[in-house]
Amino acid sequence: AQIVKLGGDDGALAFVPSKISVAAGEAIEFVNNAGFPHNIVFDEDAVPAGVDADAISYDDYLNSKGETVVRKLSTPGVYGVYCEPHAGAGMKMTITVQ
């Protein structure tokens, strides 16, 4: 599985790393790294055609350090992801599915 931290070790409001590539069906573990409230929203305008962004998003907040959400993406292409409360601070990432 690929691990993506929600929040940098230095407290930055960021996905770490901000770009990953995965094989179709490979697990992606999103882990709250800092204890700030974060969520994982797939941008409906930045996912491959036919993908339901709402179905793969995790709108609830991960509030505690160590809380984890796992997603598996099966459709190849590029996915844009953001954290709703911190998108204005630039908390966004790109996932490429091979």
UniProtKB/Swiss-Prot annotation:
It is found in: Plastid, Chloroplast thylakoid membrane. It comes from the Eukaryota. Cu cation binds at H38, C83, H86, M91. InterPro entries: BlueCu_1, BlueCu_1_BS, Copper_blue_Plastocyanin, Cupredoxin, Plastocyanin. Its cofactor is Cu(2+). One of its GO terms (molecular function) is copper ion binding. NCBIfam families: cyanin_plasto. Belongs to the plastocyanin family. It comes from Ulva arasakii (Sea lettuce). It is a peripheral membrane protein. The keyword Plastid applies. Keywords: Chloroplast, Copper, Electron transport, Membrane, Metal-binding, Plastid, Thylakoid, Transport. The keyword DNA repair does not apply. Residues 1-98 form the Plastocyanin-like domain. This is Plastocyanin. GO terms for cellular component: chloroplast thylakoid lumen; chloroplast thylakoid membrane. Its main location: plastid. Participates in electron transfer between P700 and the cytochrome b6-f complex in photosystem I. The gene is PETE. It holds the Pfam family Copper-bind.
